[in-house]
Amino acid sequence: MAAEAAATSRFAAACGALSQYVRAADNVHRARTAAAAAAVRPLPLMPGADVAGDEREEEGGGAAASSAAAQMTIFYGGRVLVLDECPADRAAALLRLAASSRGVPRDDLASTAAAAGESADLPVARKASLQRFMEKRKGRLAARGQPYRRHDAAAAARGDHLALAL
């Protein structure tokens, strides 16, 4: 009994020492990774981009003038329209006008109707094409014969094989 208690206490002492060693090693590892993480710094994706912005800021008074009349780009009906020197109040008025209008221009209605007419003919053309394909497929299948026919079926029909009937 005394030997078991001594073995248990030695085992507990060994486990305690091992635990302290693992904790110390973990702390050292964490300190190294923290130092390595602090040394990492992101690289700029566009190195010249920040320089161009600094030069514009140094020019000074140009920034106030450019905000009053800036360039406006409009995408409408598949077209791109670029307006130079568009004042902010006119841009806001144009946006309000675009938001309030709900109608579709007559040109778009005509092109939509023409596109619908072309797509109506498409299913008929597909159907005819499918019919031609199926007819050709039938011909190919008939030429090949049955897919699982045995080559020696003719010999079996003649009776050249041995019958094991008792």
Curated annotation (Swiss-Prot):
Query: What species does this protein belong to?
Result: Oryza sativa subsp. japonica (Rice)
Mind telling me what this protein is named? Protein TIFY 11e
Q: Show the domain comment.
A: The jas domain (123-148) is required for interaction with COI1.
Its biological function?
A: Repressor of jasmonate responses.
Record's keyword terms, sorted: Jasmonic acid signaling pathway, Nucleus, Transcription, Transcription regulation, Ubl conjugation
GO biological process terms, semicolon-separated: regulation of defense response; regulation of jasmonic acid mediated signaling pathway; response to wounding
Name the family the entry cites: Belongs to the TIFY/JAZ family.
What gene is this protein a product of?
TIFY11E
- Report the subcellular localization: Nucleus
Describe how expression is induced or repressed: By jasmonate, wounding, and cold, drought and salt stresses. Down-regulated by abscisic acid (ABA).
Q: Give the motif span (Jas).
A: 123-148
State where it is primarily located: nucleus
Where is the motif (Nuclear localization signal)?
125-132
Cellular component terms per the entry's GO annotation: nucleus
* PANTHER family (alphabetical): PROTEIN TIFY 11E, PROTEIN TIFY 4A-RELATED-RELATED
Q: Mark the transmembrane ranges.
A: none
Ranges for domain Tify come to 65-100
